[in-house]
């Protein structure tokens, strides 16, 4: 029995879509009711992902959150998630419009061993970028990588 045979002959499917904003485009805080241009292929210079500024932001968050932290295997999954969400929220506040932010956080126990990490991305070298920062104390190490990919 085929899939088509399982439906009555007169069955029709209807799809409805509604949009709150004019012309079906999402409203943003900057345009207050005007649709955002969807044909922008490059970010404005002031809104480009700037690795040095992002690294400073990451460093400040890590210093604040992990200054007195002790490594505990039971608590690290929650701390990792909290740090990644906190950093991503801070980056969104920095005004990188139309950028998709990806934040990767790795926390491990400090035992004097070496760790090697790598990332591979397929992106537009003119608009997309990344940065990373490392935090260490006597108990743990934390590596954060932030990727900013322009959304066309």
Swiss-Prot record:
* GO cellular component entries: cilium; cytoplasm; cytoplasmic dynein complex; dynein axonemal particle
> What organism is this sequence from?
Bos taurus
Q: What protein name is recorded for this chain?
A: Dynein light chain Tctex-type protein 2B
What lineage is on file? Eukaryota, Metazoa, Chordata, Craniata, Vertebrata
UniProt subunit comment: Light chain of the cytoplasmic dynein complex 2, a multisubunit complex composed at least of eleven different proteins. The cytoplasmic dynein 2 complex consists of two catalytic heavy chains (HCs) and a number of non-catalytic subunits presented by intermediate chains (ICs), light intermediate chains (LICs) and light chains (LCs).
Q: Which domain of life is it from?
A: Eukaryota
Q: Which GO terms describe its biological process?
A: intraciliary retrograde transport; microtubule-based movement; regulation of intraciliary retrograde transport
Q: Which InterPro entries match?
A: Tctex-1-like, Tctex-1-like_sf
Work out whether the entry's keyword set contains Cytoplasm. Answer: yes
The Swiss-Prot or TrEMBL record annotates one GO molecular function as: dynein intermediate chain binding
Where in or outside the cell it occurs: the entry states: Dynein axonemal particle
Family matches, as Pfam families: Tctex-1 (PF03645)
Q: Which gene encodes it?
A: DYNLT2B
State its role.
Acts as one of several non-catalytic accessory components of the cytoplasmic dynein 2 complex (dynein-2 complex), a motor protein complex that drives the movement of cargos along microtubules within cilia and flagella in concert with the intraflagellar transport (IFT) system. Required for proper retrograde ciliary transport.
- Family membership, please give it: Belongs to the dynein light chain Tctex-type family.
Q: Which UniProt keywords apply?
A: Cytoplasm
């Amino acid at each position: 029995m085929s899939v088509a045979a399982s439906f009555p002959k007169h069955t029709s499917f209807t799809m409805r879509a509604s949009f709150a904003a004019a012309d079906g485009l999402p409203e943003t805080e900057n345009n207050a009711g005007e649709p955002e241009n969807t044909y922008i292929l490059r970010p404005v210079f002031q809104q480009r992902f700037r690795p040095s500024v992002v690294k400073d932001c990451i460093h400040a968050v890590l210093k604040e959150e992990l200054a007195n932290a002790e490594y505990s295997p039971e608590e690290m999954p929650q701390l990792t998630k909290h740090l990644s969400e906190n950093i991503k929220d801070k980056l969104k506040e920095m005004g990188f419009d139309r950028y998709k932010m990806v934040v990767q956080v790795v926390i491990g126990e400090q035992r004097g061993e070496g760790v090697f990490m790598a990332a591979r991305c397929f992106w537009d070298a003119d608009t997309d970028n990344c940065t990373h920062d490392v935090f260490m104390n006597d108990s743990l190490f934390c590596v954060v990588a932030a990727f900013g990919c322009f959304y066309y």
